[in-house]
Amino acid sequence: FRQFSLFKNGGFNLESFEQAIRDEAKSGSVRVILNFPQNPSGYSPTKDEAEKICQILKDVASSGVKILAISDDAYFGLNYEDNIEPESLFARTCDLHPNILAVKIDGPTKEDFVWGFRSGFLTFGNSTLTSEQYTALITKLMGIIRSSVSCSSTPPQSLLLRAIKDPATNIQKNEYRNILEERYKIVRNFCNTHKCSCLEPLPFNSGYFMSFNVIGKDSEQLRKKLLNEYGIGVVSIDSKTLRVAFSSIEKEKLETVYEAIFKAAEEL
């Protein structure tokens, strides 16, 4: 399992990504997970970054390396800036190169605002695969599902199918999306206008969350302080990363919550 440095100069670290891909390619194959909007940072690549990510994958595949490109799209579509790539990287990687097998993992939990449904789907894409090869992949996948989760919950799937057919669904989704975007903009403005010596916001432009790089303090200690003294719940990803779900905070309370986070960090 290989990680790479995600950010550089406020954007996606293409150099670190390419180095990690090329290092792993020495074995003859690469498995890469493309998780956008990225959790926990809440970052999605710009149009230019998405183009370059795909070019890196294509260049490596052209050298004879087999690539499994997995697009984790659980938060896809919740973009709040105009320069974000609007299309899933799955669509780009499907016919990018014969040596690339694209996989899309997606679900309605966040995109369709159905928290707790815990259902999703997985599909494949490659321009050179035959119907027989697709059938073989699907059969393998069905076997994995039967031997692990057995079967997905039927009620959520039935409800979602009915919702998809209802013309009111998209109207409601747009209303909720606008609420999230409004909350995002408040947080974006706060982070642009307020500074804390021990909290550095990681780049964010989409999704449900944003995170801070905790400088010189322990994020778990900060999490406990916020919960015990301020009644604010956040998640410490590791000792240096604190995730905040701005999506669940009413807009009138956002500035108060973030002021408390900054204050608690300084007090540690």
Residue ranges and their predicted role:
Residues 6-84:
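Active-site phosphate-binding strand-loop segment of PLP-dependent enzymes
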Residues 123, 211-213, 245-247:
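Short hydrophobic/aromatic beta-strand micro-patches
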Residues 2-5, 105, 235:
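Hydrophobic residues at beta-strand termini and immediately following loops
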Residues 161, 173-188, 198-213, 238-241:
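Conserved glycine-rich beta-strand-loop-beta hairpin in the small C-terminal domain of fold type I
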Residues 94-178:
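Conserved core segment of the aminotransferase class I/II
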Residues 22, 54, 98, 221-268:
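PLP-dependent enzyme catalytic core of the Aspartate aminotransferase-like
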Residues 20-29, 55-66, 91-98, 127-133, ...:
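Alpha-helix termini
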